């Protein structure tokens, strides 16, 4: 009998979340730069945020007209699995030799520095490519400075290697829609767009990530770039999933493999950091930090055992964790356990572990078997 831990990915949930994200773009009324049709791409970098990039790309075939990944290696893997949807490289090319692969595989690239521009202009390509010019409007991580952006645009637009140029930027505070930097970033890219919008090479703007798409309609433009929300995870705080129409796609589950009674004053787990305050029943679950559950999760982290919520008890081990099930009913060896999923939002677990849901789902190891449903 195999170890009872699994990661189940509901591909229909991803499809429904994408449809919701797309509807937000289509229905947006407040954007002052949305002079073209609003489109929605699917960000599936980091193995679709741990959900499986190939399975996600297949599930969104016919829905998402464009996929986005971080590197050419991720794009090559998708093409090797017969994914034909156009793909955008969010970090562009890391060396000039990759540009021939971009041509061959029908990829689009982000340009975020002057060297990438020079490398592209110096190449002899079989056909021109679609370029996304990333402008640093305040994130200060990647992007052409605003002061140099018009020159960069002109360089790209005048090259025979470029068939179109999309302006893009990335928000530093989109999860705080009232932050003044967010408005400043939108205004900066708007001003640049106004200067080049009449150019034949101008393809539009791409601004909104998940948080901006959900909370800042004025950021919705030609291409919206939802990532985390496609997987049913709120880009805001851990409680928002209860008010957003998002469906968690990943369920991390296992089973109870042992039950024991612990007397008042006795401890559980490494370091003896949890002590029973009354006679307790402790369930040992086959899941630990070796499976992707955060070691930093504190006692009290919610766990669902046989449909009931109970608190984590003690330190998480590599292969196991313990839950105080004293107050629960009908618990036995073999009882099902949800560590996160449709009933326990991953953001809730992340908050108890002083991290983000993004980190938890993207760092899942291969030890737990993956099961895809609703393909």
From Swiss-Prot:
SUPFAM superfamilies: Alanine racemase C-terminal domain-like, PLP-binding barrel. Its cofactor is pyridoxal 5'-phosphate. It is an enzyme of class 5 (isomerase). Transmembrane segments: none annotated. Substrate binds at residues 141, 318. GO terms for biological process: D-alanine biosynthetic process. It catalyses: L-alanine = D-alanine. GO terms for cellular component: cytosol. Keywords: Isomerase, Pyridoxal phosphate. The keyword Protein transport does not apply. The keyword Magnesium does not apply. GO terms for molecular function: alanine racemase activity; pyridoxal phosphate binding. Pathway: Amino-acid biosynthesis; D-alanine biosynthesis; D-alanine from L-alanine: step 1/1. Its EC number is 5.1.1.1. The modification N6-(pyridoxal phosphate)lysine is found at residue 45. Belongs to the alanine racemase family. PANTHER family: ALANINE RACEMASE, ALANINE RACEMASE, CATABOLIC-RELATED. This is Alanine racemase. The gene is alr.
């Amino acid at each position: 009998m195999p170890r009872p831990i699994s990661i189940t990915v509901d591909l229909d949930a991803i499809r429904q979340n994408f449809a919701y994200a797309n509807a937000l773009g289509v229905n947006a009324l407040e954007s002052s730069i949305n002079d073209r049709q609003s489109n929605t791409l699917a960000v599936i970098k980091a193995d679709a945020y741990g959900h499986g990039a190939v399975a996600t790309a297949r599930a969104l075939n016919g829905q998402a007209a464009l996929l986005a990944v971080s590197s050419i290696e991720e794009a090559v893997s998708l093409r090797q699995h017969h994914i034909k949807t156009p793909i955008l490289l969010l970090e562009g090319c890391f060396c000039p030799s990759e540009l021939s692969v971009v041509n061959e595989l029908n990829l689009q690239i982000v340009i975020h520095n002057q060297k990438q521009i020079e490398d592209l202009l110096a190449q002899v390509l079989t056909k021109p490519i679609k370029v996304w010019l990333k402008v640093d409007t305040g994130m200060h991580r990647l992007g052409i400075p605003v002061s140099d952006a018009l020159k960069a645009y002109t360089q790209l637009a005048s090259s025979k290697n470029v068939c179109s140029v999309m302006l893009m930027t990335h928000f530093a505070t989109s999860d705080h829609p009232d932050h003044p930097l967010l408005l400043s970033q939108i205004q900066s890219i708007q001003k640049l767009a106004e200067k080049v919008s009449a150019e034949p090479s101008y393809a539009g703007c791409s601004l909104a990530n998940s948080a901006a798409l959900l909370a800042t309609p004025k950021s919705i433009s030609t291409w919206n770039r939802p990532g985390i929300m496609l997987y049913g995870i709120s880009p805001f705080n851990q409680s928002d999933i209860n008010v957003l129409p998002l469906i968690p796609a990943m369920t991390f589950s296992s089973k109870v493999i042992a039950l024991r009674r612990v007397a008042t004053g006795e401890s559980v787990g490494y370091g003896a950091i949890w002590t029973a305050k009354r006679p307790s029943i402790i369930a040992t679950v086959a899941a630990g930090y070796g499976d992707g559950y955060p070691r930093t999760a504190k006692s009290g982290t919610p766990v669902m055992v046989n449909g009931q919520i109970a608190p984590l008890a003690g330190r998480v081990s590599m292969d196991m964790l313990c839950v105080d099930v004293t107050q629960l009913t009908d618990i036995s060896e073999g009882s099902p356990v949800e560590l996160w999923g449709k009933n326990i939002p991953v953001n809730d677990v992340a908050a108890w572990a002083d991290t983000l849901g993004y980190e938890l789902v993207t760092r899942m190891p291969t030890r737990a078997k993956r099961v895809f449903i609703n393909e």
